[in-house]
């Protein structure tokens, strides 16, 4: 299983009303994994361009493959990117692919954020994960969202910039 990049893109499309129902990677019903081979393999093998408008600003999301067998897709996407969102699977922590992607972003001096996904799994320890991120990537790691609850008690997050908490339905 991947970190959830395609699922994140699908959720953004759903929240912004571009689609009426969220697709599912395992069912082959997502917007960005439309290639027959991607549907068969149940993971991304090509980069998909997903344009989304937010507050009169057009954001072009490039949903890239997570497996580094397809590193060429990631490198090509970074050539046209102004910034990046690294999606991290909270259940797996910092993986080799995360470190390689970070290195590519460092080489290109691209700004980035890390989106921590799968926080709702029962065995996630946010404090341990944050420590691991800081050990791997140093002072560039600064959380701007902190979870409300951990493990089975995860309910939402607090945005530390505006000090607003959001609890999931």
Regions found by a protein language model. Give the residues of each.
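P-loop NTPase switch module centered on the Walker A-proximal segment
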Residues: 1-88, 94, 143
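P-loop NTPase catalytic nucleotide-binding module
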Residues: 1-3, 21-22, 90-169
């Amino acid at each position: 299983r991947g970190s959830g990049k395609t699922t994140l893109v699908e959720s953004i499309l759903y929240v912004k009303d571009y689609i009426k129902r969220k697709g599912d990677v395992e069912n082959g019903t997502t917007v960005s994994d439309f290639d027959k081979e991607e549907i068969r393999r149940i993971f991304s093998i090509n980069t998909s361009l997903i344009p989304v408008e937010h507050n009169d600003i057009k954001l072009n999301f490039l949903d890239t493959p997570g497996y580094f067998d397809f590193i060429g897709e990631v490198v090509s996407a970074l050539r046209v990117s102004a910034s990046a969102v690294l999606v991290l699977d909270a259940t797996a922590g910092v993986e080799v692919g995360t470190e390689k992607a970070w290195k590519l972003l460092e080489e290109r001096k691209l700004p980035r954020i890390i989106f921590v996904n799968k926080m709702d799994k029962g065995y996630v320890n946010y404090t341990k994960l944050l420590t691991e991120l800081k050990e791997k990537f140093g002072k560039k790691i600064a959380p701007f969202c902190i979870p409300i609850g951990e493990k089975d008690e995860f309910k939402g997050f607090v945005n530390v910039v505006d000090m607003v908490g959001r609890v999931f339905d």
